[in-house]
Amino acid sequence: MSFLFESTSNNPLTRFRRSFSRTLMLTNFIINQSAQKNLSTSLREKLSQMLMLATLAVSQTVFSIEVLDDEGSLVKLDESAQRIISLAPSLTELLYAAGAGDKLVGVVEYSDHPEAAKALPIIGRYDMLDMEKILQLQPDLVVAWQTGNPRASVNRLRELGLTVYIAEPKRLESIPSHIRRLATLAGTEKLAEKVIEEFETKLITLTENYRTKTPVRTFYQVWDRPLISAGGNELINDIIELCGGVNIFADIELLAPKVSVESVLIRNPQAIIASGMDIERPEWLDEWLKWEQLSAVNTSSLFFVPPELLQRHTPRALIGAKSMCEQLDQTRAKLVSN
């Protein structure tokens, strides 16, 4: 743990360390006193050896919590985190899902779900963190966004002595694992298990209902200028496949590749699903209507799913997935009728 912050925990391991430290201090005092009172050299040597061995033992820190993060780093805590800062809106949601919401002391802008998150102190944007504010909040754990937070900022947090755990679910089925690991760090495992069970049950149901249906070529549009889609390594690709769709840009490894209108026309999606950056259907989605040769235009399959239900890798992704699956079902019905 960082020397910056003094723990007031009643954790048994912490109490043991404090007791051990007091014992070391007492032993050292006895040695000093024995020297002043001219006690035998052999006795002083034995006491010195005891002090050396005890010091060596206490220096071998034993951590009660050890969890691997998404970069393979072993994050160690000597007790469950009590003051957590989240560096991404999606991570804030995951922490609440893990039952650790009441341990959050700071979040970044746009951390708006659940409602309680809106009342938490803001420590900047995900890409522009206020280091001074973070230090003032004295976190014992900072949860960082692997591909979103600037690497220099994450490194700086570590240099300042903070414990940083890096996370980002990249697959739909990995969300339960992320929730479970965060719960382990926060000591909220029992609260998290109910959320995990509900998620896994819903995921199985959606998979059974949609994955084996007639494939629908699908173009997922994140933004219009530049034209951005989702590649094969993005969690959104998992959702498209879950719904029985085929991501027309699944062959691109980038998470959010820039694509051209020409490439979309060539791949001729049967459905276009947009999210944009707001809760309202983006006006630019209708710009595809001028391309009458598109199958998606012929079947009126220009759909919208709110971005927070797909672009945040949290349990709510299944709400967005259900909406997408129902939309692709509409396209299937229209293709059959045509």
Report residues per predicted region.
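A short, structured surface patch at a secondary-structure boundary
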Residues: 83-137, 141-147, 248
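Bacterial N-terminal signal peptides that target proteins for export
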Residues: 13-16, 20-23, 27-51
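Short secondary-structure boundary segments
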Residues: 88, 146-147, 222, 252, ...
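His/Asp/Glu-enriched short active-site or ligand-binding loop at hydrolase and phosphoryl-transfer sites
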Residues: 108, 233-256, 276, 303-304
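Extracytoplasmic substrate-binding proteins
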Residues: 65-67, 73-74, 140-141, 151-228, ...
